[in-house]
Amino acid sequence: MSKTHLTEQKFSDFALHPKVVEVLEKKGFHNCTPIQALALPLTLAGRDVAGQAQTGTGKTMAFLTSTFHYLLSHPAIADRKVNQPRALIMAPTRELAVQIHADAEPLAEATGLKLGLAYGGDGYDKQLKVLESGVDILIGTTGRLIDYAKQNHINLGAIQVVVLDEADRMYDLGFIKDIRWLFRRMPPANQRLNMLFSATLSYRVRELAFEQMNNAEYIEVEPEQKTGHRIKEELFYPSNEEKMRLLQTLIEEEWPDRAIIFANTKHRCEEIWGHLAADGHRVGLLTGDVAQKKRLRILDEFTRGDLDILVATDVAARGLHIPAVTHVFNYDLPDDCEDYVHRIGRTGRAGASGHSISLACEEYALNLPAIETYIGHSIPVSKYNPDALMTDLPKPLRLTRPRTGNGPRRTGAPRNRRRSG
């Protein structure tokens, strides 16, 4: 992490459990991010927290550190049974649950606390086998958690810590009834430590905190600035006919190390993937109907650098921690203003700089005024020369082979295509 992203507050300044501090130091975490510096004094004192921070500011480590410290510092509930986890971390998507689990593994190995993972799509029996042996911290999505609870594979009567991550996304995906169902099966709010984290603390999220938490403290980091100041924003106005060629020209011109391209529909994402894969780019496709194993493989390949470009719907816009994304392209302007913030928040993370390029086409340009009102500023407009757009483009591929794309590793320099000033 960049030093500009950190505070003077050190993890060692807090009365954290020694094993937790040891893991943090081994992982290179010495100074707190702003959200961690605000949250830890409260959670270590047993206070509930509802936190808002821009994506990529350390929310996950804030609640994991608090959770492990609390469980190590407090005994389990008397007569706790093997199917009763001590902590529950709820996430809106399978990918986010998997990432939280991965981030928690070093802490679990050092402390002896057992982790469990529960998400839909696949792995039912494998996940259940782990749960049957007993877990201390259960991380999962609401649907699979309810499934296990209804079959008595898990019982939430001994929960001591609850974390709700990306709470606003839970509402967007219609999971709020599931969340309330799970909360009703836990001990009362004043008998557990409750943490809620979200990129936005809307009225409905605050209402949930009031319902399910014990007089939570609200903490916010840079709430007045909805888009990161390290993200360069840029806007083009292409015609529908020139839109794809403009995207491909910009990719050749920018030559991003790691880019995510967002579109509003599955069909549009597949179309973009086909054009880029045909042009030799190492590109992956992430939409809602991609099988879970393939989704995780694509994300892993993108994170490792085996893929340079990921084309995605908003299923990937929130919660995913993909480091070192240099560029975000909004091929379609989103219909939801908040999705614009979450999309471009994939870049410029953890103190790094990033570049967001949006295409306001004839179909989605009407979304722009609401987006600019929401973010509080106009997006700088750039012009392009239609005569300079790429024309020597191969016929797009269709999805008749693996979606991760088999384009060759990019070598050499990009083609010399320049846009007008």
UniProtKB/Swiss-Prot annotation:
Keywords: ATP-binding, Cytoplasm, Helicase, Hydrolase, Nucleotide-binding, RNA-binding. Its main location: cytoplasm. A motif (Q motif) lies at residues 9-37. One of its GO terms (cellular component) is cytosol. Residues 392-421 are annotated as: Disordered. ATP binds at residues 53-60. It catalyses: ATP + H2O = ADP + phosphate + H(+). One of its GO terms (biological process) is RNA catabolic process. Residues 245-390 form the Helicase C-terminal domain. CDD domains: DEADc, SF2_C_DEAD. A motif (DEAD box) lies at residues 165-168. It is found in: Cytoplasm. Signal peptide: none annotated. Residues 40-219 form the Helicase ATP-binding domain. GO terms for molecular function: ATP binding; ATP hydrolysis activity; RNA binding; RNA helicase activity. Component of the RNA degradosome, which is a multiprotein complex involved in RNA processing and mRNA degradation. NCBIfam families: PRK04837.1. This is ATP-dependent RNA helicase RhlB. The lineage of its organism: Bacteria, Pseudomonadati, Pseudomonadota, Gammaproteobacteria, Enterobacterales.
